[in-house]
């Protein structure tokens, strides 16, 4: 056995890459883990002992598909793990998966638009081409969650609770904030095109809550944001855990990381081609515009005790559960 796991994690934003790293870093203790990604964020962060095959997001559609196929067909692996898109983001896996019957093929079933599932006849494709389907904490109400080979785990997180740094040290060293000041963190994950919206949101929050510290967590510093407000830190969960309130989108990482560390999330549900942020946003404080966000933050601030930040969060990391299912 080569004892190599190959993880397909193509797709925008942080979610696909972060899930791959959450699983890959614990799997890599006992085997080689290779991740295929086209997330530009992959160039900025620690690869957690995984080998990252980066395909430029500037590469055209056919080039990307070709590169993916070449990597998969030339990698000797004993697990092939596909995140979210059963046929690949561009359908590039549709004809190669049936050739790989000898390798256990695992689908990570993040929520996905049911119209896409129907249009591409994914139900029968998954039934024929995947040995196991793992739902990473997204609940029962998913298009493929009733297939017979489905396993459910808690959400996948890139840090176990005992690995998180002390909240107060994050506040002082990373946020550069006094421990007794309430902190509002804007989490600018998602698409680069949304960065200017998050910047505007950050400035409005700062105007409205001068008694609080407001920070923006983003891979790149937005144009109109003073450098003192900007935080670039990966993994983001270490920062979310140290905030009093998080304001962001309703993507996979933001929602489940905030839930795990017990910090309230005020969230905008952004439109995505395949993801249903609106469905996930039902679990958090959903808002439609900046004014609603300000009102909601104001209400939450009245309820929050700063002392909460002294306790360490406790949660189950679904990536650890998934490791057992996949290696079985």
Describe each region flagged by the PLM.
Residues 1-214, 221-328:
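Nucleotide-activated sugar donor-binding and catalytic core shared by glycosyltransferases
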């Amino acid at each position: 056995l080569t004892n190599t796991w190959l993880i397909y994690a193509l797709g925008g934003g942080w979610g696909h890459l972060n899930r791959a790293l959450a699983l890959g870093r614990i799997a890599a203790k006992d085997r080689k883990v290779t991740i295929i990604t086209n997330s530009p964020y992959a160039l900025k962060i620690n690869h957690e002992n995984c080998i990252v095959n980066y395909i430029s997001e500037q590469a055209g559609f056919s080039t990307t598909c070709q590169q993916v196929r070449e990597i998969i067909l030339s990698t000797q692996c004993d697990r092939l793990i596909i995140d979210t898109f059963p046929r690949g983001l561009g359908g590039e896996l549709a004809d190669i998966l049936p050739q790989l019957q000898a390798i256990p093929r695992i689908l990570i079933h993040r929520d996905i638009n049911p119209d896409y599932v129907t249009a591409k006849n994914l139900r029968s494709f998954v039934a024929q081409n995947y040995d196991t389907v793992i739902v990473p904490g997204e609940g029962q109400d998913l298009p493929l969650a009733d297939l017979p080979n489905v396993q459910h785990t808690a959400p996948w997180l890139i840090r176990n609770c005992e690995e998180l740094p002390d909240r107060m040290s994050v506040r002082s060293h990373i946020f550069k904030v006094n421990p007794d000041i309430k902190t509002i963190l804007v989490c600018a994950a998602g698409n680069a095109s949304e960065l200017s919206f998050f910047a505007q949101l950050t400035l409005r929050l700062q105007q409205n809550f001068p008694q609080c510290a407001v920070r923006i967590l983003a891979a790149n510093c937005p144009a109109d944001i003073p450098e003192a407000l900007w935080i670039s830190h990966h993994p983001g969960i270490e920062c979310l855990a140290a905030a009093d309130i998080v304001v962001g989108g309703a993507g996979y990482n933001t929602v489940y990381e905030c839930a795990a560390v017990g910090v309230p999330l005020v969230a905008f549900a952004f439109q995505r081609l395949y993801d249903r942020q609106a469905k996930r946003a039902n679990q958090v404080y959903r808002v439609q515009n900046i004014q609603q966000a300000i009102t909601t933050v104001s209400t939450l601030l009245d309820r929050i005790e700063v002392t909460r930040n002294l306790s360490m969060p406790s949660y189950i990391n679904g990536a650890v559960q998934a490791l057992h299912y996949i290696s079985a």
